[in-house]
């Protein structure tokens, strides 16, 4: 029997996605060194939409917009809103305590809202930028909504735990948290925040084999 070779960086579903103009735009913008994360984001968003899970999208920790552009393209395509929370000024000193006290105020800053908007491109029409310290920027207008996808990429314990705690009651049953850096081995605060959250809620982690060890948590309760 003749052996078959498979392109290991691409799932079988590429044959369908590769024909889609939205997907082609994403592969041109997303970090080419972490395509596993791109596929994980796309496939889990697709699953949520196919199951008709109610709610808009949100992201806490935007930085340059690498994952925001994925969420924006998908949200815009299906007519949902995307709420983007970030200081847009790097780490806040209020979060630099405990395991995270080794980092500096302003780390991972230097990217403006306008730069992120330009990076996202035409899909920015569905985006709402909430600049400032989270969760202070989470207002009643946000709490009146339901969410189906919440991406969290804050690196540090305090903002990650706050994002999980604040959005969990707002998340639709079956909605998905996409949390970066969980098993990176470097961002201890990310691991601690997710583990503590899961212990408190009875939810469970699904680990992804991407570059920085993302974890997904699907709301089951």
Question: Residue locations for each model-derived region?
Answer:
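N-terminal auxiliary segments of SAM/dcSAM-dependent transferases
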Residues: 1-5
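S-adenosylmethionine/decaboxylated-SAM
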Residues: 7-35, 46, 51-221
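N-terminal pre-P-loop "Q-motif" helix
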Residues: 37-40
């Amino acid at each position: 029997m003749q052996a078959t070779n498979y392109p290991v960086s691409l799932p079988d579903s590429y044959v369908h996605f590769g024909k889609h103009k939205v997907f082609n735009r994403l592969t041109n913008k997303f970090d080419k060194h972490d395509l596993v994360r791109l596929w994980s984001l796309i496939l889990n968003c697709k699953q949520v939409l196919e199951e008709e899970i109610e709610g808009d999208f949100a992201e806490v920790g935007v930085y340059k917009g690498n994952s925001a552009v994925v969420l924006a393209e998908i949200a815009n395509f299906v007519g949902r809103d995307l709420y983007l929370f970030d200081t847009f000024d790097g780490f806040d000193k209020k979060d630099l305590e405990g395991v995270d006290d080794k980092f500096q105020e302003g780390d991972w800053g230097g990217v403006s809202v306008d730069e992120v908007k330009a990076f996202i491109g035409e899909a920015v029409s569905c985006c709402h930028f909430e600049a400032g310290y989270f969760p202070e920027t989470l207002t009643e207008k946000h709490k009146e909504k339901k969410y189906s996808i919440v991406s969290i990429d804050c690196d540090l314990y305090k903002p990650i735990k706050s994002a999980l705690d604040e959005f969990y009651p707002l998340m639709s049953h079956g909605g998905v948290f996409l949390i970066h850096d969980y098993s990176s081995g470097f961002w201890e605060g990310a691991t601690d925040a997710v583990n503590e959250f899961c212990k408190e809620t009875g939810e469970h982690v699904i680990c992804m084999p991407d570059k920085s060890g993302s974890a997904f948590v699907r709301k089951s309760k």
